[in-house]
Amino acid sequence: MLGLFRKRNIAAGDMLFGEYIALGSILRAEGMNDIERTKAIVKTLHNKDMSDTIALLLIPYGLQVAEGYVAWKEKENQECYVPPRPEATQAGIDQRAKEVGDMATVVQFAERFGRTFEQVYNMPYLEVFAIWKVDAATARYQRRLDAVLKSKKDK
């Protein structure tokens, strides 16, 4: 199954958003654990210098691969920045707000994804980051699709 992606020899930047989901589903169906899936994705995309951001975006259906990527990096003694969890105090909440952006951003995030401020505060940083990035990628993909449909309609 992975040969299908290898034959196309595509780079991560050229890959359509839907293909991320397809690749992730194939790897999950093959019963790979998180670290194996992450390594397979990196090898499949022929990109050894893949950034943390791209690795986090690869599988929109969950954070297992993002966590697997961190574990893999740690296993190989490579640096992979994971912000420390702040204390559950007002200072910690203020620190968390700065990490995510600012207080308005936290509130906006909570409203957009149907969560309370406390839930956002208690979410792992990687999860907050990945939800924002996946949402932005989905919106970009939708805008491109809308533009193509509009241009076909105008013809």
Predicted segment positions?
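An amphipathic, hydrophobic-aromatic interaction surface with interspersed Lys/Arg
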Residues: 1-155
